[in-house]
Amino acid sequence: MAHQKREATSDNGGGDEEWASKRPKVVGAAAEKEHILTSDASHETNGDEAQGGDASRKENTVSTNPCVSDEKAATNSNVSSGHGVILTSVEADAAEDKGCRHTMEDAWVLLPDASMESPGNLRCAHFAIYDGHGGRLAAEYAQKHLHQNVIAAGLPRELMDVKAAKKAIIEGFRRTDECLLQESTKGNWQDGATAVCVWVLGQTVVVANAGDAKAVLARSTSADGEGAVDDAKSQLKAIVLTREHKAIFPQERARIQKAGGSVGPNGRLQGRIEVSRALGDRQFKKVGLIATPDVHSFEVTRKDHFIILGCDGLWGVFGPGDAVEFVQNQLKETSSATLAVRRLVKEAVRERRCKDNCTAVLIVFKH
């Protein structure tokens, strides 16, 4: 069966939407029977330029249909609190802009039905950002293969098992990195990519990251969590779900030194690379850089409204609470994940002068 190719639809209403009016084609790139929405290096550029900058930029966003399921699974949680509630659907979208860089090295995945060739009773959705450095090849490789490897490693498909899910994700990262290093050796390229990934399995969210890309959860502060995200009275707090991995941090520095590497006065591994965990980067793998992710999970409750995934470019100009407040305001105004994530990236690049590639994925929970 050939890869499916679909034209993305638009909710354009003028104004902000003109900034990203050229919508990309959507290509199923990871497996023959996989319905996947991914970033695409061949997207068109709209010709807009940054104020005060010479580099042209692009922003692309692909709408997804909500993944609807009446899952009744309940699981253990190491993050969540509050009353359990059935999560009926997940709506997600992504936006990107290359900023003042000449190339876009980020890649992202929107996979509202992530069961692939392993269907089961458990809802499975997957979303990710791979922030490339030194090129785009490592990010694209992870985009195409990491989720496949996680599925193959035994991601639960019938009954939720948090321990098994975490084990499968860690093994999927290991296998992806192993194969990526083989490919990069054959191709004589040295790209790397940090990663932040989310799997929605039934009522449970599992988050994995390696490097400095982040995931931030917006959770209601009300006692009962009944307030909708677009309720003017609803107050949300930002919960960072990931831990950055940088060579300058004491725990990572100690691990690097134990592996025979060093951290320079500039806080970089071997004086060259800031992150201490990433996929690829074969020249640093023998001196302490690893691809092992941190993995955390929580059970979704009515208090949990949305998750923002972002590369380091986004978080360089947005604090977690600031980003949650911005997205909440956009959802109050438009009730559209597509417009909210698009405006988030636009704000980061156009108004806050993000110089790096900027990519965000917005995942909205429907209760």
From Swiss-Prot:
Reaction it catalyzes: O-phospho-L-seryl-[protein] + H2O = L-seryl-[protein] + phosphate; O-phospho-L-threonyl-[protein] + H2O = L-threonyl-[protein] + phosphate
GO biological processes: signal transduction
Cofactor(s) required, per the database record: Mg(2+); Mn(2+)
Protein's UniProt keywords contain Metal-binding: yes
Keywords, ordered alphabetically: Hydrolase, Magnesium, Manganese, Metal-binding, Protein phosphatase
Broad class of enzyme this protein falls into: hydrolase
Gene3D superfamilies per the UniProt record, alphabetical: PPM-type phosphatase domain
EC number: 3.1.3.16
Cofactor detail note: Binds 2 magnesium or manganese ions per subunit.
Binding site for Mn(2+) 2: 131, 312, 356
Biased composition (Basic and acidic residues): 31-46
Residues annotated to bind Mn(2+) 1: 131-132
PROSITE patterns according to UniProt: PPM_2
InterPro entries cross-referenced by the UniProt entry: PP2C, PPM-type-like_dom_sf, PPM-type_phosphatase-like_dom
Molecular function in Gene Ontology: metal ion binding; protein serine/threonine phosphatase activity
Stretches the record annotates as Disordered: 1-79
Residue ranges of every copy of the PPM-type phosphatase domain listed in the record: 91-365
The family this protein is said to belong to: Belongs to the PP2C family.
Name of the protein: Probable protein phosphatase 2C 67
Protein's organism: Oryza sativa subsp. japonica
